[in-house]
Amino acid sequence: MATGKIVQIIGAVIDVEFPQDAVPKVYDALKVETGLTLEVQQQLGGGVVRCIALGTSDGLKRGLKVENTNKAIEVPVGTKTLGRIMNVLGEPIDEAGPIGEEERWTIHRAAPSYEEQANSTELLETGIKVIDLIAPFAKGGKVGLFGGAGVGKTVNMMELIRNIAIEHSGYSVFAGVGERTREGNDFYHEMKDSNVLDKVSLVYGQMNEPPGNRLRVALTGLTMAEKFRDEGRDVLFFVDNIYRYTLAGTEVSALLGRMPSAVGYQPTLAEEMGVLQERITSTKTGSITSVQAVYVPADDLTDPSPATTFAHLDSTVVLSRNIASLGIYPAIDPLDSTSRQLDPLVVGQEHYDVARGVQKTLQRYKELKDIIAILGMDELSEDDKLVVARARKIERFLSQPFHVAEVFNSVPGKFVPLKETIRGFKGILAGEYDHIPEQAFYMAGSIDEVVERANKM
């Protein structure tokens, strides 16, 4: 093993000098004598390599010895990782002893070839009305939850995990990328209480960790998911939050000497996103269904980071601050959310017609809002008054109590089957429930519950 020494330290970026005939390759893992792991990013010439620290660089000094491991970072994979919490290097952080893995895989892998890839049109039922109706998920597809700060990305993701992981008997991998430690803790206990912890591998690189950890932790989680997929399983891969992955790249990019591009992001933004997203795919042996939370800075969907993510997804679920301010949760915007699966050939004609009917009614209501604000409801035609009444019922019926939010509001969560969702909205559009007051539709599960409520009013 070649040995070098540290010659420069700037934050998370460290330069190491090696003998000219033993310069490490890009992505090789280096070990500092203090125990810190570095990953080679650039070769600067003269035997010097520039690395990112996968851990804090506090206490390092020039002249410390560094050993080249001659291989990239490797992490444990396989069933031994289930029920465990690990860091970016695959080391356990749950104080439950060693992982005891039988195999380790490198975190840098090629995406499956074009011939190996497979696509599926099988739907994945989530039990969340607005998602199943407007932006249905495909098994083996990629889903993005877009939203600004505090509109409910993590709660939506936890509900999806709870519903899908309980209904779906396969394995899941959760990568916490630059999120709050508190959320990681909540998530762990949620999984434990739902008795699905033994089917989930948890990998965390939290907000308080150096950018190197946050940049690589998504790849660590993905590698574990790929192993399950290559064994012929259908695996769920959850990432919270993709934006922090981009941000970690931005933090180290300037230190690596790259010129910033639009809005100060790294010039390699699209490539870094592509490297991660192209690996999250389904093959002929197994599938990876991924759900990714995407933070939207300042609620601006045209920001380069969320805009780059959009291109890779099959379904986009957009959370809206306006809907959250009305007290309607989940605060999903039915006019902004899209899915490639919403096609009569995939979901069937009835589902397609109901979904488009709901969007058409809500869009008409949106257009009428200006007239209502200036002239009032009385100036509308009878037809328009009916559209407004139905749209307001639809808006409220799109809300639903979540199981994971039960601890906060004491309202029992509801899982609504897709058939019930379609039946309910079809009835509202057909005018079957015009006699029911709109407040009966708020935070209800199925349409039968609404009718029952209305009878008690």
Swiss-Prot record:
Keyword ATP-binding: yes
SUPFAM superfamilies with a match to the protein in the record: C-terminal domain of alpha and beta subunits of F1 ATP synthase, N-terminal domain of alpha and beta subunits of F1 ATP synthase, P-loop containing nucleoside triphosphate hydrolases
InterPro entries: AAA+_ATPase, ATP-synt_VA_C, ATP_synth_F1_bsu, ATPase_a/bsu_AS, ATPase_alpha/beta_chains, ATPase_F1/V1/A1_a/bsu_N, ATPase_F1/V1/A1_a/bsu_N_sf, ATPase_F1/V1/A1_a/bsu_nucl-bd
Primary site of residence: membrane
Annotated positions binding ATP: G147, G148, A149, G150, V151, G152, K153, T154
Location of this chain's protein in the cell: Cell inner membrane
Keywords associated with the record: ATP synthesis, ATP-binding, Cell inner membrane, Cell membrane, CF(1), Hydrogen ion transport, Ion transport, Membrane, Nucleotide-binding, Translocase, Transport
Top class in the EC scheme: translocase
One protein family per Pfam: ATP-synt_VA_C
E.C. code: 7.1.2.2
Catalytic activity from the UniProt record: ATP + H2O + 4 H(+)(in) = ADP + phosphate + 5 H(+)(out)
PANTHER family: ATP SYNTHASE, ATP SYNTHASE SUBUNIT BETA, MITOCHONDRIAL
Subunit composition and interactions: F-type ATPases have 2 components, CF(1) - the catalytic core - and CF(0) - the membrane proton channel. CF(1) has five subunits: alpha(3), beta(3), gamma(1), delta(1), epsilon(1). CF(0) has three main subunits: a(1), b(2) and c(9-12). The alpha and beta chains form an alternating ring which encloses part of the gamma chain. CF(1) is attached to CF(0) by a central stalk formed by the gamma and epsilon chains, while a peripheral stalk is formed by the delta and b chains.
Function statement: Produces ATP from ADP in the presence of a proton gradient across the membrane. The catalytic sites are hosted primarily by the beta subunits.
The protein's name in its UniProt record: ATP synthase subunit beta
Organism: Glaesserella parasuis serovar 5 (strain SH0165) (Haemophilus parasuis)
Gene that produces this protein: atpD
